[in-house]
Amino acid sequence: MAEWHKIIEDISKNNKFEDAAIVDYKTTKNVLAAIPNRTFAKINPGEIIPLITNRNILKPLIGQKYCIVYTNSLMDENTYAMELLTGYAPVSPIVIARTHTALIFLMGKPTTSRRDVYRTCRDHATRVRATGN
């Protein structure tokens, strides 16, 4: 879908965010779009499966780096988001939002509030969900 690259482009222009990626979780579990040469560009299928199947996951690997789960409502139809923090310094907020076909990963800079990252990621996911993807 061409809209994925547009979302990543939109996020990369914003100075509040460090990294972003969109990953298919229904079929291939591959990265569909990402900011090049960043952590989320290295996400592999083995890291996606535990996120969507294990509701009690505490320290998932994302892009070969550990993260700490803050809230997990990823598979909930009303919330469809998971909040995490990086497990390494400097600590940055991460939000994963679920559309019908993909996961949107968004990492804020250490100075960006969790609320800003959450709101932005959820807004993009809600917009994509409205189109049916």
Curated annotation (Swiss-Prot):
Lineage summary: Viruses, Varidnaviria, Bamfordvirae, Nucleocytoviricota, Pokkesviricetes
Task of the protein: Participates in either intracellular transport of viral proteins or intercellular spread of the virus. Cellular profilins modulate actin filament dynamics (polymerization and depolymerization) via direct binding to actin through an actin-binding domain as well as by modulation of other actin-binding proteins. In contrast to cellular homologs, the poxvirus profilins seem to bind actin only weakly.
Keyword Ribosomal protein on entry: no
UniProt cross-references to InterPro entries, sorted A to Z: PFN, PFN_euk, PFN_sf, Profilin_CS
Family per record: Belongs to the profilin family.
UniProt organism field: Vaccinia virus (strain Copenhagen) (VACV)
Keywords assigned by UniProt, alphabetized: Actin-binding, Actin-dependent inwards viral transport, Cytoplasmic inwards viral transport, Host cytoplasm, Host-virus interaction, Virus entry into host cell
UniProt protein name: Profilin
Protein location: Host cytoplasm
GO terms classed as biological process: actin-dependent intracellular transport of virus towards nucleus; symbiont entry into host cell
Gene3D superfamilies in the cross-refs: Dynein light chain 2a, cytoplasmic
Keyword Transmembrane helix applies: no
Lineage top rank: taxon: Viruses
GO cellular component, one term: host cell cytoplasm
Subunit structure: Interacts with host TPM1. Interacts with protein A25.
Single GO MF descriptor: actin binding
Name of the gene: OPG171
Disulfide bond entries: none
